[in-house]
A protein has these predicted regions:
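Alpha-helical transmembrane signal-anchor helices
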Residues: 138-194
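A "functional boundary" signal
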Residues: 1-142
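Alpha-helical structural motif
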Residues: 122, 129, 186, 193-196
Length: 196
C-alpha cells in the first residue's frame, strides 16, 4: 500500500514532502533509491524520474532536470502512457533554452496524446504553451527561408561578378595577344630594315 513505510508509494510521498520542505538532497537520495528499485524490478521509472527532474529544477540544475525529464518521457512512451507531463515539461524547458525545433516536436506529440486520452486538464496546460512554441517555430522557419533566399541571391551575384571578371581577363588576354603579335611583326620588319 501507498502508506506502508518503506513501500515505493510511501517513499515517493516522502520525497515530495522533502521537496516541499526544500530538503533537496534528502529527496534526491530517496528518489534515486526508488529509481534503482523500479529499474531492478522492471517497473516504469517515469515517476521517480519526474521527481528527480523536479528536485533538480528546484536546485537550478537544468542539465540533470533535462536528463530526468527525458528518461521519464521515454518511460511513459514505452509504457504507452498517454497522459504524461514529462514530455511537455521537457518541451517547455527546451523552448526556454532556444531549442525550438525539438520543443515543437515534443509539444505537438504531447498535445496529440492528451487529446487522444481526453485529458482535459493536461490539454488545457499544453494548449497554453503550444501556440507560443508554434509561433516561434514558424518564425524560425521563415527566418531560415529568408536566410536561404539571401544566400542564393548572394551566390548568384558572386557568380555573375566572377563571370564578368573572367570575361574581362579573357578580353585583356586577347588584346595582349594582338599587341604581342604587332610587336613581333614590327621587330621582324626592323630586322629586315637593319639587314638591308
Amino acid at each position: 500500500s501507498m502508506r506502508r513505510p518503506g513501500s515505493q508509494g510511501y517513499l515517493l510521498m516522502m520525497s515530495e514532502k522533502l521537496l516541499y520542505e526544500e530538503k533537496y538532497d534528502e529527496a534526491i537520495e530517496i528518489l534515486k533509491s526508488c529509481y534503482k528499485t523500479h529499474e531492478e524490478k522492471g517497473y516504469s521509472v517515469a515517476i521517480p524520474s519526474i521527481g528527480l527532474a523536479n528536485a533538480y529544477a528546484f536546485m537550478g540544475n537544468t542539465e540533470l532536470q533535462k536528463k530526468y525529464l527525458a528518461i521519464s518521457a521515454i518511460a511513459d512512451i514505452q509504457a504507452a502512457t498517454k497522459e504524461y507531463i514529462s514530455l511537455w515539461k521537457l518541451a517547455n524547458l527546451l523552448f526556454q533554452e532556444g531549442d525550438i525545433k525539438r520543443a515543437y516536436t515534443y509539444i505537438e506529440c504531447s498535445m496529440q496524446d492528451a487529446t487522444f486520452c481526453n485529458a482535459r486538464y493536461r490539454t488545457q496546460e499544453i494548449s497554453e504553451l503550444l501556440p507560443v512554441i508554434s509561433r516561434t517555430y514558424e518564425n524560425k522557419l521563415k527566418e531560415e527561408k529568408t536566410q536561404m533566399v539571401a544566400l542564393v541571391i548572394l551566390t548568384s551575384v558572386l557568380l555573375i561578378i566572377l563571370l564578368i571578371a573572367l570575361m574581362f581577363i579573357f578580353y585583356q588576354m586577347k588584346r595582349l595577344n594582338v599587341a604581342r603579335k604587332a610587336v613581333n611583326t614590327m621587330n621582324e620588319e626592323l630586322k629586315h630594315i637593319n639587314s638591308d
